[in-house]
Curated annotation (Swiss-Prot):
GO terms for biological process: reductive pentose-phosphate cycle. Its EC number is 4.1.1.39. RuBisCO catalyzes two reactions: the carboxylation of D-ribulose 1,5-bisphosphate, the primary event in carbon dioxide fixation, as well as the oxidative fragmentation of the pentose substrate. Both reactions occur simultaneously and in competition at the same active site. Substrate binds at N116, T166, K170, R288, H320, S372. It comes from Nitrobacter winogradskyi. Belongs to the RuBisCO large chain family. Type I subfamily. This is Ribulose bisphosphate carboxylase large chain. The active site is at K168 (proton acceptor), H287 (proton acceptor). Disulfide bonds: none annotated. The record marks K327 as: Transition state stabilizer.
Amino acid sequence: MAVKSYQAGVTQYRQSYWQPDYMPLDTDILACFKITPQPGVDREEAAAAVAAESSCGTWTTVWTDLLTDLDYYKGRAYRLEDVPGDDTCYYAFIAYPIDLFEEGSVVNVFTSLVGNVFGFKAVRALRLEDLRFPIAYVKTCGGPPHGIQVERDKLNKYGRPLLGCTIKPKLGLSAKNYGRACYEALRGGLDFTKDDENINSQPFMRWRDRFDFVMEAVQKAEQETGERKGHYLNVTAPTPEEMYKRAEYAKEIRAPIIMHDYLAGGLCANAGLANWCRNNGMLLHIHRAMHAVIDRNPHHGIHFRVLTKILRPSGGDHLHTGTVVGKLEGDRASTLGWIDLLRESFVPEDRSRGIFFDQDWGSMPGGFAVASGGIHVWHMPALVTIFGDDSVLQFGGGTLGHPWGNAAGAHANRVALEACVQARGEGRHLEKEGKDILTAAAAQSPELKIAMETWKEIKFEFETMDKLAIANK
């Protein structure tokens, strides 16, 4: 082995961290960054700087480089690509050796890949577009506490999407009135009701009171309908200790599912809660509150497909994914891409859906995709088509806004869903024939007929801010 020598000074990043001839290993963690460089900084130097600063490099040569094998540990920028339709930025592909990261710690992966490098002056803007976990790393992570099949078996619900509802108004109700709203929606035909992301333990409704009244509602609805029901009890709390206290109480009162805000609450807390749920037979619903602060800017931040991909090994049985047709951001192609990343065992590279790498999840179970945000009965045919069976379709205002009340709103959604599932089984095209399918079902359901009348003019037709960059073919 050649003797290493030390020369003080500053060298260009590209001398060590730009390797266009590098062939990524099966064990490498791969990342695709969208880089907008500062004026005067060439592509290779900016990409190499990102590789260095997100792995083991720094701004100057240090003598302690001689004490390790940098050729083994360093990140390597190995490919650059143009961004279709945008000449201000480009894609940089970087490979990281697996031994740079603690096993089973998505927290540690994020600390490097989206850490201080995002404030680096050599780049004007930086966005993590995609990430590939090698199967060797996937095997060290806990993943969803239970997954799709186990949840269906626990609830005895098969062959259709599940139906949910976020209780509104999201803030201000007393615990007793909150529980009453849950009961009406559950007895009307929903599978789940849900705490909104910002319901924790406020003066108007303390968490223990809410848990008690809600579980009374769940159990009463189960007795009346003969179906398993649930409510996502949000255990997100000021401290991990308080979070586990709330989770333990949910278990004590026989709740089947709890909820966590994984970005606001933190990935460390989320992984710990997922482990607790796995060990205690509790399902875990994940809300993505705060995601748009991170992912909506198309040039700086983290794409939501990465936030989806990081959640799966961290742990969650459900994840909010947007709706395509509702009030929240998300185009159809991209949404289908990250739904697959959440649910499928293997997802191949597909640039038409924004997927830059093959992703093999091995035997790690998948989670339910949750569609929520501005949806109502008219959206049902499209939602069933887009999301398929392994999803939870959550109608908040689209349940509670029914003129006849929560139970009628829930019943309308259940009738619409079952009509779409039946029509799909008959080979009908749900999106093309949706109006006819719903109209026929409404002839036998006054609740659905009124719901269709109420929301027939409601649309959310705004331009998507974060669009797929796909070359014209």
